[in-house]
Design a protein with these regions (language model features):
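A C-terminal cap/extension of S-adenosyl-L-methionine-dependent methyltransferases
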Residues: 182-186, 219-275
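A short glycine-rich, Lys/Arg-flanked "PGG" loop and its adjoining helix->strand segment in the class I
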Residues: 151-166
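Acceptor-substrate binding/catalytic loop of class I
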Residues: 187-205
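Class I SAM-dependent methyltransferase SAM/SAH-binding core
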Residues: 75-127
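A conserved beta-strand element that flanks and buttresses the S-adenosyl-L-methionine
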Residues: 139
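Conserved class I S-adenosyl-L-methionine
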Residues: 5-69, 105, 112, 166-193
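Short catalytic micro-motifs in class I SAM-dependent methyltransferases
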Residues: 142-146
Length: 275
């Protein structure tokens, strides 16, 4: 993979740092702070239950199957930290790049086997220091709602992807059936993560964004349809219980509600090949 090394950067401890202490970017003539270091360890977060982690693993497998499979070069935007992408890489993968604005995530990134060239880049998704047409597959795992300019990030993805390359975006769904129920009942829900989210996407929002930028074959797979009280979810640790939860959540309830009403989703698409 070829980086744009003409951009100002430092290289230290295996990390290309293109941020140089930058803490904000300008969008529409307005300076907006960047999420520089979230430093979030989900294992110690009381909000995160075994069923949520199990749902994330299911999403990871969907990304591996529908986006990363047979890709020689992969870019993970917002990866690193506790991300498990390295476990799902294709046998043909030769290059794996993690791009994140947070140095903590890069320092703590899980690195794949030595036969895969790994690049760690501290930079924004809105201005990636990667030359055109370098990547076969891009994943944006639960990150697009944290960026400043979502459309610019998708445009940059389109630029660095090879023709025929794929992009996969995973997110929580603001239009899930159970969020609608909570809203209609006017139940107050507090979250210790809302202040980190700049957007609250639906799957349709992401589909439209990808299509507008030029991606084709846009598809969505809804997941995480079963939502139980936290007290119950915290007790569901046995593999048989988690397997039953996954079957109900991602098979039975998906058939009932359709692909756009799950609590999470994967939307993926392809950059068309040049004619």
């Amino acid at each position: 993979m070829k980086l744009d090394l003409k951009k100002d950067h430092n290289y230290q401890n295996g990390i290309y740092d293109f941020m140089a202490g930058t803490k904000s970017i300008v969008v529409a003539n307005k300076e907006i702070d960047i999420e520089v270091d979230y430093a979030w360890d989900y294992a110690s977060d009381p909000v995160i239950t075994p069923t949520i982690i199990h749902e994330w693993k299911y999403l990871d497998k969907l990304v591996s199957k529908n986006v990363l499979k047979n890709a020689r070069s992969i870019l993970s935007i917002g990866g690193g930290g506790s991300s498990r992408t390295h476990e799902y890489l294709s046998p043909v993968t030769q290059e794996f790049t993690i791009l994140n604005t947070g140095m903590w995530d890069l320092v703590n990134a899980q690195i794949p086997i030595e036969t895969i060239n790994t690049y760690l880049i501290c930079a924004t998704g809105e201005d990636m220091p990667i030359l055109d047409s370098q990547i076969d597959a891009i994943e944006i795992p639960a990150t697009l709602d944290h960026v400043i300019d979502a459309r610019k990030v998708i445009e940059e993805c389109y630029r660095v992807l090879n023709g025929g390359g794929k992009i996969g975006i995973t997110l929580g769904n603001s239009d899930s059936w159970y969020r609608k129920v909570v809203s209609n009942l006017r139940i107050q829900v507090t979250s210790n993560h809302d202040h980190h989210h700049n957007f609250h996407f639906t799957s349709k929002d992401v589909e439209n964004l990808l299509s507008e930028v030029g991606f084709t074959e846009v598809k969505t797979i809804g997941t995480a349809y079963l939502k139980l009280p936290k007290t119950i979810e915290r007790k569901m640790k046995a593999p048989v219980l988690l397997a039953a939860h996954r079957f109900i959540s991602n098979t039975m309830l998906r058939l009932l509600f359709g692909n756009s009403k799950g609590g999470m989703f994967l939307t993926y698409a392809m950059k068309p090949t040049a004619r």
